[in-house]
Each structure stands twice: as C-alpha cells, then as structure tokens.
C-alpha cells in the first residue's frame, strides 16, 4: 500500500532497534505507519501498539498494517496520555517521530501550509484551539512570547505589530494571507520561506508540542524499559530530549556545588546510544527534503 508520507531516518531507526527480540514496541506517533511497518517486518516476534491523535492517519495505518493484525493494535489520543496506560507491558522499544506528516502539510484543508485557504494547524482536528484563534485572538504580548520562545524569531515584536495592524482591518482567516503578510515584510534567507519560523511557533502553541513531548518523556523515564528513540525537527525539541537523556544517564544526583558525592553514585537509568544526534544522509535529504531538519537521539534503559 503506497503511503502519502515518507518516514524519515527509517534505516537509522531499524539499526537502533535491531537488538530487540520479544515484547511490545510502542510507536508513539504512528502517522501513516512507515516506521511501524518496517519494525513489524524486521521483528516477527514483536507486538506493536501505534498511537496517534489524527483519525485520518489511524484509518490509513489500519489498512496498511492489516497484514500484521495479529501483532498490531492502535490507540487514538495524545501519546502523553496513552503511554501511562501501558506501563505494565513488557516494553522492548519506544519510538516517537515528533513532526508534521507530509500529508498534513500538503492537505490544504488542514491549514498547515503557506498556501492553505484555512488557518488551522491542529494535528487533532477535534481539538478546540486552532491557529485561527491564536493569530486573531491572542493579545500582543502573548503572541510575542510565542514567536520569541517557539520560533526563536529575533524580530518578534515587528512581526506581532504587523499582525496587530492587519487584525484591525479584519480577521486573518487563511494561512496564505498570513504567509503573504510576513513575506512582504521579512526577507527570505536562502531557500527558507520567511514565514517558516512563525508557522512553527503557532503550530507548537496550537498542539502544545513541547508540553506533549515533555510529559511523554517524563512517563518514559518512569517506565524505564527497553530502547527509546526520539526524532525531532527543531532545536527546542532536540534540546528537551537531550536534557532528559542526560538526566537519565546521570549516576550522581548530588548538586554541582557538593564537595563530594553522598548519593551513592549509582542512579543512572541506562546509557545514551547516540553521542550526537543522527541525521539524514545526503541521499535521503535529496529524496525527501523534509528529512533535512530531522535529528534522532536514542537511549537504552538498564534491564
């Protein structure tokens, strides 16, 4: 079954999870099933649970993974909410690919792309908050904080001022109108559209992406089983993953100013498998340009 989405770093994912044999594999971001299909094919003794909050993606994946129906099941919802319900399972591996799928980006009705007639950006179409409310209803100081923190936009004040002036004329109702507004006043850097970081910031706010991955990592640390691999697409997420992995690998819990260790120096939960994040090969980057910003980190908990 042909997928509308190319899974990033698929070979690297398979390599990280190659030692797995039996147990459960949790795909926290099932999407269109590319990673899950590869794992199920490579590990005939693994059972897999796929999680996603997008009903369209789940519908597609159920059909794609039908040949593995005896070893595959799914849960609809946020992975930060589903993971705690799986704690008692013999988990061998956990994967999370934190990004927007190609189908979500390319489907104009979802309001993610620069040319969309809608301004939406909800990964879960049934969620209450959308980009329309963020752009048109948030006060200026809150918008500025979002652009500064989630988009790391240096001229966030200028951007908010432009949006505020535009709102006086009427509601901004399409992603295309917003991207054109930004394009008129901000320069393109290389091949990067000037609205890229602003759209990223709005999407993160709409879907609570940083809160979601933070809560999930907290739960994964409590589960403390098997191998974990996280694929992120921007520096904020990657930094969060890096810090959690570092915390899990710390043997000493004493404060930095402590004269000597008094905690026993035996608190590490496991080891970091990737000293530096794995990135797409030149071949993959060329075949799938959206893989260029992908970074994968992996960790193994002590058995």
Swiss-Prot record:
GO terms for molecular function: rRNA (cytosine-N4-)-methyltransferase activity. GO terms for biological process: rRNA base methylation. InterPro entries: RsmH (IPR002903), SAM-dep_MeTrfase_MraW_recog (IPR023397), SAM-dependent_MTases_sf (IPR029063). Its EC number is 2.1.1.199. GO terms for cellular component: cytoplasm. It catalyses: cytidine(1402) in 16S rRNA + S-adenosyl-L-methionine = N(4)-methylcytidine(1402) in 16S rRNA + S-adenosyl-L-homocysteine + H(+). Pfam families: Methyltransf_5 (PF01795). The keyword Transcription does not apply. SUPFAM superfamilies: Putative methyltransferase TM0872, insert domain, S-adenosyl-L-methionine-dependent methyltransferases. It is an enzyme of class 2 (transferase). Specifically methylates the N4 position of cytidine in position 1402 (C1402) of 16S rRNA. Belongs to the methyltransferase superfamily. RsmH family. This is Ribosomal RNA small subunit methyltransferase H. The gene is rsmH.
């Amino acid at each position: 079954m042909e997928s509308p989405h190319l899974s990033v770093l698929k070979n690297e994912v398979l390599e990280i999870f190659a030692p797995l044999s039996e147990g459960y594999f949790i795909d926290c971001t099932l999407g269109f099933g590319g990673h899950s299909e590869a794992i199920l094919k490579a590990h005939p003794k693994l059972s897999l649970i796929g999680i996603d909050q997008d009903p369209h993606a789940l519908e597609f994946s159920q059909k794609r993974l039908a040949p593995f129906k005896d070893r595959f099941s799914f849960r609809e919802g946020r992975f930060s909410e589903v993971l705690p319900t799986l704690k008692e399972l013999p988990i061998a591996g956990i994967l999370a690919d934190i990004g927007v799928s190609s189908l979500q980006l390319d489907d104009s009705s979802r309001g993610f792309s620069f040319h969309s007639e809608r301004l939406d950006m909800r990964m879960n179409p049934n969620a209450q908050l959308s980009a329309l409310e963020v752009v048109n209803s948030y006060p200026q100081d809150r918008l500025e904080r979002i652009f500064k923190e989630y988009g790391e936009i240096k001229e966030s004040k200028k951007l908010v001022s432009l949006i505020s002036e535009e709102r006086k004329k009427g509601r901004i109702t399409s992603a295309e109108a917003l991207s054109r507004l930004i394009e008129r006043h901000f320069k393109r850097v290389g091949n990067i559209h000037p609205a890229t970081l602003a759209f990223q910031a709005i999407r993160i706010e709409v879907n609570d992406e940083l809160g979601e991955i933070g809560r999930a990592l907290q739960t994964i640390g409590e589960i403390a089983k098997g191998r974990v691999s996280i694929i992120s697409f921007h520096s904020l997420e990657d930094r969060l993953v890096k810090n959690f992995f570092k915390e899990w690998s710390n043997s000493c819990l004493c404060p930095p100013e402590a004269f000597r260790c008094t905690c026993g120096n035996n608190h590490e939960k496991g080891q970091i498998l990737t000293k530096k994040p794995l990135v797409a090969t030149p071949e993959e980057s060329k075949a799938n340009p959206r893989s260029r910003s992908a970074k994968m980190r992996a960790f193994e908990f002590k058995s």
